[in-house]
Design a protein with these regions (language model features):
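Short, hydrophobic/aromatic-rich segments at coil-to-beta transitions
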Residues: 30-38
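Beta-strand/loop substructures that line and gate deep hydrophobic ligand-binding cavities in soluble
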Residues: 41-96
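A general marker of short, structured functional hotspots
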Residues: 17-18, 34, 92
């Protein structure tokens, strides 16, 4: 599954948020300037953060799962955490 988010956070901020969020949950598998990869018992996950026109960053989170799994729930939760870095008052309401 692929999940997308557009944010005003910088690519560096997004990747630091990913390290904090996934670092205690999954094993790091890959790290480049704009991409992080993780793996665990639930599957593989990659996060990429690319500068987009203007002041935005395009965030893509991809899992190797075909349907909504526990890993996909983590991916969606992470995107809400990215949103919270820009808007600290953001309240996460999803059941993930």
């Amino acid at each position: 599954m692929k999940y997308f988010h557009r944010t005003s956070a910088t690519p560096e901020e997004v990747l630091e948020t990913a390290k904090r969020f996934f670092g205690s949950r999954l094993v790091p598998a890959e790290e480049t300037a704009r991409r992080l990869g993780y793996r665990g018992t639930t599957g593989k996950l990659t996060v990429s953060a690319l500068p987009e026109g203007g002041h935005y960053t395009f965030v893509e989170v991809m899992t190797d799962q075909v349907g909504e799994s526990e890993l996909d729930k983590l991916a969606k939760r992470f995107l809400s955490e990215v949103h919270r870095t820009v808007e600290p008052g953001h309240e996460v309401r999803g059941a993930y």
